[in-house]
Amino acid sequence: MQAVGQLMLDIEGTALSLADEALLRQPEVGGVILFGRNVESPEQVRELTDSMRAIKPNILIAVDQEGGRVARLRAGFSPLPAMGKLGEKFEHDPITALDLAYCAGYLMASEVLAVGIDFSFAPVLDINGVSRVIGDRAFHAHPIAITALSAEFMRGMKLAGMATTGKHFPG
């Protein structure tokens, strides 16, 4: 039987267990997403990602590092504001807000890549104010502002060398 796709899974701790190692060796596993429970420091995350790649060199490693309350990498990493703060700035100073969005994307991607993580599921492209779950994770309530700010955030990510993954769907 031929596999149609690969799975992205998570692990429980800050280091690979024997069970994690066995699971990563399975051909169906193509990626791992890290959560806060997997993170102690940049050095520890680098050791973790290196250990994953020792088992499966081409594994994709991801994280949710949006800024604000959705930041799995905290200790030793630069805190970024919720993207809604950039939307607020956009209201009265769009040029600065766009520059800050670019810088935030670059900084986030640079730090994430430096510890061996391939990409962050960011930015959030939802419309601010539609969902309490999303809240200030979204840039703005107006699609034109969302488009402008997210384009700059993604431009920063790309300059750092990271692929972008806008979310959520259906949007």
Predicted regions and their residues:
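N-terminal glycine-rich anion-binding loops that anchor highly charged ligand groups
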Residues: L16-V29
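Enzymes and membrane/adaptor proteins characterized by extended Gly/Ser/Thr/Asp/Glu-rich
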Residues: E28-L48, M52-I146, H168
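Hydrophobic "anchor" residues on beta-strands that sit immediately upstream
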Residues: Q6, L60, A163
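Phosphate/pyrophosphate-binding betaalpha-module
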Residues: L149-P170
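Boundary/entry segment of secreted carbohydrate-active catalytic domains
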Residues: M1-L16
